[in-house]
Every structure is written in C-alpha cells, then in structure tokens.
C-alpha cells in the first residue's frame, strides 16, 4: 500500500522562531490550516488593498497555527478543527468562519460511487484492503492520510474512526494539495479533503468525490446536517486582537466576503446550522 511521495515543506513560508508578535511594521501574521488558505488569502489581498496593511498568510497545519498564536509568533490562527482539551486552557478566542464538508475522494477511473461510514472506518483501519470488497474492481486500496498536525485528520478521525486506529501503512501527507494530487494520479487511491478543494481551479488533474451513506457532499447537505462528515472552520486569537488584526477578522466575516467563501466551496459562518462535530 505504499505510495512514493515527493517531500516538501511549507515551513519556509513562516519561520515561527523568527516572527515577532503583533502587527508591527504594518504587517498581520496569519498561520494554520491549509484548508483555510483560500479564505485567508483572498481576504488578505482585499484587506491589503483597502488598508495598506500587509497580511502574511501561511498554511502550516491547524496545530502549528494554534501553537504559533499561543506563543505569540502569529496573531491569528486558522484551523479546520476546534480546540482540544489542552488547547482550551491557552486563553484563545474562538471565531467560527465557515462550515465545511470533508469529501472522500477517489481516482476518476474508480467506479465506486458510495461508501458507508462503517466501510470508511474499516478501510482506514486496514480491515478492508481491496476495492472488490465494497463493490469495486479487484484492485488494492491505496490509503492516503493526513499528518497528525492536520485539523482535517482530527475531524475525520473524530467522526469516522470511532476509536479505531488508522492503518499505519497509509501514505501520510502534510497538505490538502498533496492528497488531491496523489489520489488523482493513483487508480486505487482513496483520500479525504475539504469539499472546496475537490474541483480546484489550480489543479491540473481531477479527483471524484463519492457519496457517504448515500449523501452527496454539497453545500445543501452540509448546511442541513445531512452529510455525515462536516465540521466548522475557525480563526483563533490570543486574547483580544490588536485593532489591525481585528479589522482583518471583521472583513473575513463581512457580507463582502460571503461570495468569496462560497466560491471557495465553503458556507459562510452566518449561513446554515453548525456543521458536524469539532
């Protein structure tokens, strides 16, 4: 079940040890989830045009972003999961930004159209290892997972795995784009990514989202709570943010950003019911 992966890192985008806290020199630092990048980057560009303030956005993973905000090396953390028990003790302010569904993706040549949550759990636990066991062709399942810093992994684990450990033979990748790319190029692969990244305008290859429990991962089913793998996306700050950072947050939550959030494949936080579990 091994898949060859080209290693790379986003850490150069934000040197955690080198950053100073605060919006000094007219710069706001935002770090965290790769899922949240489309929202954070579009808002950063528009906010910079309006205010002249520079907004540095980096996708290092939800856990890295939360750590950066808690130790003062970033002003805003973006996260595709809620705070865990230990993080809840850090004095962070939680700001829901959007609702999101986690899409289960396969290669376009894979004929499987639907998996139950139980089948997904057994696949990611290594109990189901061939697509023929779930109505597909006789082909080994190539598991693609996210790294432990990923908020998407934490949400998937919480909703799907029900205490079962992940199969250690899975390819473990550090970013949404990597997962999408590997699945698009590997006939037997399965992965999971934010619903908004399934049809990426930047990708050169395609993946296909399958139904889960016979429910399609679309905005309407996420908003209604019918799609089973749903979660919220968050910003976190360490206490009350500085005026410049608060202005950026207010812009992200404004009606002006709603259309951009929808175009990115998410549901603005002010629309629909809360999605899934943290």
What is each stretch, according to the model?
Residues 1-17:
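Sec-dependent bacterial lipoprotein signal peptides
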């Amino acid at each position: 079940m091994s898949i060859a992966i080209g290693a790379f890192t986003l850490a150069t985008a934000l040197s955690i040890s080198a950053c100073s806290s605060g919006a000094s020199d007219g710069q706001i630092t935002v770090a965290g989830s790769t899922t949240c990048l489309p929202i954070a980057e579009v808002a950063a560009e528009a906010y910079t045009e309006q205010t002249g303030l520079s907004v540095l956005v980096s996708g290092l993973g939800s856990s890295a972003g939360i750590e950066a905000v808690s130790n003062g090396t970033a002003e805003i953390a973006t996260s595709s999961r809620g705070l865990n028990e230990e993080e809840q003790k850090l004095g962070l302010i939680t700001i829901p930004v959007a609702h999101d569904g986690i899409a289960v993706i396969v290669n376009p040549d894979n004929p499987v159209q639907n998996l139950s949550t139980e089948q997904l759990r057994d696949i990611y636990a290594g109990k189901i290892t061939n697509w023929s066991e779930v109505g597909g062709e006789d082909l080994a399942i190539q598991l693609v997972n996210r790294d432990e810093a990923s908020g998407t992994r934490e949400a998937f684990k919480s909703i799907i795995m029900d205490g079962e450990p992940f199969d250690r033979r899975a390819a473990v990748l550090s970013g949404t784009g990597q997962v999408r790319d590997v699945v698009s190029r590997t006939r037997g692969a399965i992965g999971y990514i934010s619903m908004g990244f399934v049809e990426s305008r930047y990708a050169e290859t395609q993946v296909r989202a399958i139904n889960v429990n016979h429910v399609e991962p679309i905005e309407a089913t996420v908003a209604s709570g019918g799609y089973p793998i749903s979660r919220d996306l968050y910003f976190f700050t360490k206490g009350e943010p500085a005026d410049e950072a608060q202005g950026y947050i207010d812009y992200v939550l404004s009606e002006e950003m709603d259309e951009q959030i929808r175009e990115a494949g998410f549901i603005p936080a002010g629309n629909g019911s809360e999605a899934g579990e943290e």
